[in-house]
């Protein structure tokens, strides 16, 4: 089987790392060999797989050793739950340098040192509020072929998902990158599944799975475990297995996204009654003022 390079993008705090690690833990049950490359400066892309606080990052270890050339693969690559290989690229100190540089350095080092040999999936976990050059690196350099956007029914998550789709479109024609689908991580906002489905349709993709909110996820996280490991027989574990099966069956089915404008996004929110038009806001304000008079 040829190597599948997938990436999970999403705005900070959306539950992207949790969703990706639970999905990958479920993929292992399908006898898939997996390498996770964390591309988020928080370096939390592997903690549930390694049961550790935060993995030492490639950038941190390279700084200690002198340069990345002074590192060995075993210095940066750790083996976690059911043999999943884990690497964190890391980022610079806040306010200094470009976090994307760590991503570029790490991927090149891993490829040159054979980390991609003998795996079925490489999964990049990428911060997606900013689709700056560095964080777009897995897309731009034609590494990640299938992008899964983790989002919710909240306006900023929808906005970020649309922005990420713009980033994918920019490189879709020059490389082979495609949008695999949206994963909605339930926030229990109004009309959430309908909104997520509507955005997926507008972006020319699918809502690949709607992950319901369940406190068992937090219980597992406190123990630095995936739900798959902590509560394998739970309904939530089944949700992640369904998501993993859908991702596994989605090979070659990605699309070139059709992002929408900010105005179109706001119109969509108004159609769903989530956002009020300026006329409605003005009318409400006038009604309030009239009531005071």
UniProtKB/Swiss-Prot annotation:
Q: What does this protein do?
A: The key enzymatic reactions in nitrogen fixation are catalyzed by the nitrogenase complex, which has 2 components: the iron protein and the molybdenum-iron protein.
- Reactions performed catalytically: N2 + 8 reduced [2Fe-2S]-[ferredoxin] + 16 ATP + 16 H2O = H2 + 8 oxidized [2Fe-2S]-[ferredoxin] + 2 NH4(+) + 16 ADP + 16 phosphate + 6 H(+)
- The reply to whether Iron figures as a keyword in the UniProt entry is yes
- Which EC number(s) are documented for this chain? 1.18.6.1
Q: GO molecular function terms here?
A: 4 iron, 4 sulfur cluster binding; ATP binding; metal ion binding; nitrogenase activity
Biological classification of the source: Bacteria, Pseudomonadati, Pseudomonadota, Alphaproteobacteria, Rhodospirillales
What Pfam families does the record point to? Fer4_NifH
Official protein name in the record: Nitrogenase iron protein
The record's similarity note reads:
Belongs to the NifH/BchL/ChlL family.
Query: For ATP, which residues are the binding ones?
Result: 10-17
Instruction: Say which enzyme class the record assigns.
Output: oxidoreductase
What is known about its subunit structure? Answer: Homodimer.
Maturation and modification: The reversible ADP-ribosylation of Arg-101 inactivates the nitrogenase reductase and regulates nitrogenase activity.
Instruction: Tell me if Lyase is a UniProt keyword of this record.
Output: no
GO annotations under biological process? nitrogen fixation
Q: Where do the annotations place [4Fe-4S] cluster binding?
A: 98, 132
- InterPro entries for the chain: NifH/chlL_CS, NifH/frxC, Nitrogenase_Fe_NifH, P-loop_NTPase
* Known cofactor(s): [4Fe-4S] cluster
Keywords, in A-Z order:
4Fe-4S, ADP-ribosylation, ATP-binding, Iron, Iron-sulfur, Metal-binding, Nitrogen fixation, Nucleotide-binding, Oxidoreductase
* UniProt cofactor note: Binds 1 [4Fe-4S] cluster per dimer.
Residues in coiled coil: none
Could you tell me which residues carry ADP-ribosylarginine?
Answer: 101
């Amino acid at each position: 089987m040829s190597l599948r390079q997938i990436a999970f993008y999403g705005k900070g705090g959306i539950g992207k790392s949790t969703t990706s690690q639970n999905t990958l833990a479920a993929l292992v049950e399908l006898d898939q060999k997996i390498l996770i490359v964390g591309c988020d400066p928080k370096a939390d892309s592997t903690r549930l797989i390694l049961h550790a606080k935060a993995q030492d990052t490639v950038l941190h270890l390279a700084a200690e050793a002198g340069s990345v050339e002074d590192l060995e693969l075993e210095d940066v690559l750790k083996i976690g739950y059911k043999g999943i290989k884990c690497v964190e690229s890391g980022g610079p100190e806040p306010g200094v340098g470009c976090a994307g540089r760590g991503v570029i350095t790490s991927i090149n080092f891993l490829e040159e040192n054979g980390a991609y040999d003998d795996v079925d999936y490489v999964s990049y976990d990428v911060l997606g509020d900013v689709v700056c050059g560095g964080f777009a690196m897995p897309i731009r350099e034609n590494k990640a072929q299938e992008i899964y956007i983790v989002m919710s029914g909240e306006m900023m998550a929808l906005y970020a998902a649309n922005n990420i789709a713009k980033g994918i479109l920019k490189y879709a024609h020059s490389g082979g990158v495609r949008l695999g689908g949206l994963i909605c991580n339930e926030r229990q906002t109004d009309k959430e599944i309908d909104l997520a489905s509507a955005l997926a349709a507008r972006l020319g993709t699918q809502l690949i799975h709607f992950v319901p909110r369940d406190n068992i996820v937090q219980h597992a996280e406190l123990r630095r475990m995936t739900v798959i490991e902590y509560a394998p027989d739970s309904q939530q574990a089944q949700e992640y297995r369904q998501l993993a099966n859908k991702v596994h069956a989605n090979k070659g089915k990605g699309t070139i996204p059709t992002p929408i404008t900010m105005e179109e996004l706001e119109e969509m929110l108004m159609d769903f009654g989530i956002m009020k038009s300026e006329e409605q806001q003005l009318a409400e304000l006038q009604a309030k003022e009239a009531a005071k008079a």
